[in-house]
């Protein structure tokens, strides 16, 4: 798990109009913190959910990424204001 990678994460439960469900998100924490969270098998990492509908993403503070997903290429963006925390244990390896 490295900074800038796109992972599929479960964002439920969400409040209000926040992004929810299982969706792609960009890892935004530094690599040392990610490695420690995985090694200790506990902790959370900050992520920014991304959407392929980039016209809805308000500027400034956009986090964008592109990653190879099975069968298709994903490109999307999400404003840094959408930052969420995800536990490392349920993230797929």
Swiss-Prot record:
* SUPFAM superfamilies per the UniProt record, alphabetical: Cell growth inhibitor/plasmid maintenance toxic component (SSF50118)
Enzyme Commission code(s) on record: 3.1.-.-
Example GO biological process: mRNA catabolic process
List, in alphabetical order, the Gene Ontology terms for molecular function in this entry. DNA binding; RNA endonuclease activity
| Alphabetized Gene3D superfamilies for the sequence | 2.30.30.110
**What top-tier enzyme class does this entry carry?**
hydrolase
Specify the domain of life of the species encoding this protein: Bacteria
Decide whether keyword Transmembrane is in the record.
no
Keywords, sorted A to Z: Endonuclease, Hydrolase, Nuclease, Toxin-antitoxin system
Q: Which InterPro entries does its entry note?
A: PemK-like (IPR003477), Plasmid_toxin/cell-grow_inhib (IPR011067)
Subunit (UniProt): Forms a complex with cognate antitoxin MazE1.
General function of this protein: Toxic component of a type II toxin-antitoxin (TA) system, its cognate antitoxin is MazE1. Probably an endoribonuclease.
The Swiss-Prot or TrEMBL record describes its family as follows:
Belongs to the PemK/MazF family.
Name-wise, this protein is Probable endoribonuclease MazF1
């Amino acid at each position: 798990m490295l900074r800038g990678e796109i992972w599929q994460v479960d964002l439920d439960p969400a409040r209000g109009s926040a992004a929810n469900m299982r969706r792609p998100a960009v890892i935004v924490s530094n690599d040392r913190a990610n490695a420690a969270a995985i090694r200790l098998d506990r902790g959370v990492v900050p992520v920014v959910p991304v959407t392929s509908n980039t016209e809805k993403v308000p500027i400034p503070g956009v986090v964008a990424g592109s990653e190879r997903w099975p069968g298709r290429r994903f490109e999307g963006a999400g404003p840094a204001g959408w930052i969420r925390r995800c536990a490392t244990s349920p993230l797929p390896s």
